[in-house]
Curated annotation (Swiss-Prot):
One term of GO molecular function: chlorophyll binding
List of residues binding chlorophyll a 3: 124, 191
Protein name (Swiss-Prot/TrEMBL): Light-harvesting complex stress-related protein 1, chloroplastic
Membrane disposition: Multi-pass membrane protein
Residues involved in chlorophyll a 5 binding: 190, 208
Name of the coding gene: LHCSR1
Binding residue positions for chlorophyll b 1: 45
UniProt binding sites for chlorophyll b 4: 144
């Protein structure tokens, strides 16, 4: 026994490999740094997360971020994805609703100066709207940090708590959260996919309004009108009838 202890003491500390149990994945990993999982463990953990959806039945990682990531990185990225998805869903809905209700004085538009595409509403809305909004955002973000972040300040300030499920802030006023794990994972996947679609949608909304200078529904109606006229032209051409001219406002769409 004494001989074994002397041999162990003779091994340099720098060459010892530590065995750490990952608190998130529950797997035992061996690495040169305590708690650092090998890439296989990171990939295996990522495959267990909600959001793995057809046609990408495996983890969708074309840029290879997982190759150099840790489980902590993956958890932090998932938290960011959920947060950005939720904001994008609100933004996409806000674009459409804001453009339809901009004529209602109740919505901080007492003088009717808020009009046109939603990309210009930011500059048109008065200061009385932004101060309460910034306070509300600050309160919401402070609550999210308090619930989920392990170290709000200092090194690794945005690391998540080991027992925190990314995106789960305990906000469920309607009691919609399933108690069955599989049902919960399915619902989480739906939220992620809707958030991903919303992030693409809000980017498309902004690009479309910058190029076309028209509101979302207005563009949709004009596009439909143009398609009808073009189809009518084909019929008229086949029948030898005079062609219906395309209005100037539809030519650029």
């Amino acid at each position: 026994m004494a001989m074994m202890m002397r041999k162990a003491a003779a091994v340099p500390a720098s060459s010892r490999r530590s065995v750490a149990v990952n608190s998130v994945s529950g797997k035992r990993t061996v690495s040169g740094k305590a708690g650092a999982p090998v890439p296989e463990d990171v990939l295996a953990y990522a495959k267990t997360l909600p959001g793995v959806t057809a046609p990408f039945d495996n983890v969708f990682d074309p840029a290879g971020f997982l190759a150099t990531a840790s489980v902590k990185d993956v958890r932090r990225w998932r938290e960011s994805e959920i947060t950005h998805g939720r904001v994008a869903m609100l933004a996409a809905l806000g674009f459409i609703v804001g453009e339809q209700l901009q004529d209602f004085p109740l919505f901080f538009n007492f003088d009717g100066r808020v009009s046109g595409p939603a990309i210009y509403h930011f500059q048109q809305i008065g200061q009385g709207f932004w101060e309460p909004l910034l306070i509300a955002i600050g309160v919401a973000e402070s609550y999210r940090v308090a619930v989920g972040w392990a170290t709000p300040t200092g090194t690794g300030f945005n690391s998540l708590k080991d027992d925190y499920e990314p995106g789960d802030l305990g906000f469920d006023p309607l009691g919609l959260k399933p108690t069955d794990p599989e049902e919960l994972k399915t619902l989480q996947t739906k939220e992620l996919n809707n958030g991903r679609l919303a992030m693409i949608a809000i980017a498309a909304f902004v690009a479309q309004e910058l190029v076309e200078q028209t509101e979302i529904f207005e563009h949709l109606v004009l596009r439909f009108e143009k398609e009808v006229i073009l189809e009518l032209e084909d019929v008229e051409r086949d029948l030898g009838l005079p062609l219906t001219p395309l209005p100037d406002n539809l030519k650029a769409i």
